[in-house]
Amino acid sequence: MNIILFTSLVAFFVFLLILKYWINFQKSKGIGKYIRKEGPSSHFQKSGTPVMGGIIFLIVSIPFLFFKETFFPSLSTILFGLLGLLDDFKLMVNKDYGIRPLRKIFLSFIITLLLYIFSFHDYKIYWGSKLIISSRIFYVILFFVVFIAVPNAINLTDGLDGLAGGTSLITLFFFLIYNFQFNNELTLEISLMITALIAFLWFNSHPAEIFMGDVGAFALGGFIASLSIINKVELLLVFLGGIFLIESLSVFIQVFFYKWKKRRVFLMSPLHHHFELKGWKETKVVWRFYIIHLIMMIGGIILWNLT
């Protein structure tokens, strides 16, 4: 345990230095975020902010590819992170759009297929200590839903300073506590990912000096999805990723009603933009979403332990 804490402490300052260099490098090259005209007008001032701070999450995972216990989550983090990185590069070139949504989902499907090949196959699905079902078909469906949904959901959540990073941090603290008893390489990787997130939030807190980019959102999504599979808490992920689910549902509802009734349910989706346009300050939206995320996670854990 002491080794994990010491390593994380040293790593925090290393990550701060890496991010500071990355910010300065992008500024010197004129690299920065392009803000789409369709977004809230208050976001126009963020134009030019350095991007792809989430590369640091890939740096964390690369060494852990060489350990049996951490190969699967590391591979998941890196593959989804590379998908996000490709999207970021396309956004830099095309300005107004990156990888098209359907193509992004298709690529997520291909990555998930590769991950399924490399994963251990325990077809049991639990809620707490209760076995819900043991079925290869249901497990495969759940596996694909988790890996396609979570990275894309975190990507949708990444729209305000500190929002995706902070909510992911809350979720990862659950997995750290859940795995701390084992005191193995996976525990160390989770601890270092949390450390990297804290270092990132040092610069991403409002007003952000750098954004995580799609590389960060997808890497975190791949990591969290893999942890839910490893720890057999796939169903609990609905509560562990509460805000991710809410943000995704808001987009689905908005698109569905617009196509059906030609009207919008929200002023703008994802949901965090709706509250911005309602007059909430960005920091208020972020902190209230943190609270909702934490409450949903605690509520889910209580329900999980009742069985």
Swiss-Prot record:
Keyword Transmembrane annotated: yes
Pfam family, one: Glycos_transf_4
Top-level lineage group: Bacteria
E.C. number(s) listed in UniProt: 2.7.8.13
Principal place of residence: membrane
Intracellular or extracellular location(s): Cell inner membrane
Function: Catalyzes the initial step of the lipid cycle reactions in the biosynthesis of the cell wall peptidoglycan: transfers peptidoglycan precursor phospho-MurNAc-pentapeptide from UDP-MurNAc-pentapeptide onto the lipid carrier undecaprenyl phosphate, yielding undecaprenyl-pyrophosphoryl-MurNAc-pentapeptide, known as lipid I.
Family label: Belongs to the glycosyltransferase 4 family. MraY subfamily.
Protein name: Phospho-N-acetylmuramoyl-pentapeptide-transferase
Organism: Dictyoglomus turgidum (strain DSM 6724 / Z-1310)
